[in-house]
Regions:
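A detector of single, family-specific signature residues
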Residues: 1-267
Length: 267
């Protein structure tokens, strides 16, 4: 469900809880239609979350302004330990009316699709790494050590020639090898799909330009652009670095300036 709160346009206007509605397109349409009957200009906002941008796109297509708010940047009162959907909705309505909320950049469906594809490949890489670590740990526990570079053709031949006294251990070895082969095939398949999708992507020229940097191959460049989106939304490099979390943290007061490690604000 969605908790809905309303704030009147003036700063001293009333703020009240409207209702709880189902999280469905039909319920959202009925809500927007009913609120539009007063003739007022409607401005919606909601926290970014697992439901994505469907609500924003539906309301925008209907002609309404809708902002997706970054949860980590919502101002909160110190000591406020009570969190409910109703309180969150009322707080968002007040802050949105005051202009105190920070909206996230909303990608178009094509950009979101490329980003999902890139993230799927990253998940495949993590799965492959985990499978390799599991096999390495298994072999280490049973006294098998390979002194040369791992995961090469020679290393695979060495794995295929291993023998164990216990048949169950050999079953585990074969299962680990099969898992690694499946994860490798998944990673390579998604990599090829990324290369294919880039041919028709609007930001493909930016990806190719980024590859002029040393050490930046196609997949890395596509990942950066897919996550950043439209770079022109940043007024200067300082804003971009702050978004990425590559600027130092700071706790300064008066004439004293203290800087710490980077903020790591990005993903």
């Amino acid at each position: 469900t969605i908790a809905v709160a309303l704030a009147e346009g003036s700063q001293r206007g009333a703020v009240c809880e409207h209702r709880q509605i189902s999280n469905t397109p039909a319920a959202l349409t009925r809500l927007a239609t009913k609120l539009s009957q007063t003739g007022s200009v409607l401005r919606f906002c909601y926290e970014a979350g697992p439901c994505g941008y469907g609500i924003q796109r539906q309301l925008t297509a209907a002609g309404h302004d809708c902002a997706v708010v970054a949860p980590s940047l919502i101002p909160r009162k110190p000591g406020d330990r009570i969190k409910t959907d109703r309180r969150d909705a009322i707080n968002l309505a007040k802050l949105h009316r005051a202009g105190a909320l920070t909206a996230v950049w909303v990608p178009d469906p094509a950009h979101e699709a490329v980003r999902d594809l890139v993230r799927a490949r990253l998940a495949a890489v993590r799965s492959l790494r985990q499978a390799r670590q599991q096999l390495s740990g298994f072999l280490l526990r049973h006294g098998h050590h390979y002194s040369r570079p791992a995961w090469t053709l020679m290393h695979r031949r060495w794995l295929a020639g291993l023998r164990f006294e216990q048949p169950a251990h050999h079953i585990v070895l074969e299962d680990c090898i099969a898992t690694i082969e499946a994860a490798t095939a998944r990673r390579d398949r998604l990599t090829a799909q990324i290369e294919t999708m880039l041919e028709n992507w609007a930001l493909a020229p930016v990806v190719h330009a980024l590859q002029s940097l040393r050490g930046m191959a196609l997949v890395s460049a596509a990942t950066v652009i897919a996550e950043l989106g439209d770079i022109t939304r940043f007024a200067n490099p300082r804003q971009l670095m702050a978004y990425l979390g590559l600027v130092p943290s700071e706790h300064s007061s008066g004439g004293t300036r203290r800087q710490g490690g980077i903020t790591k604000a990005g993903n």
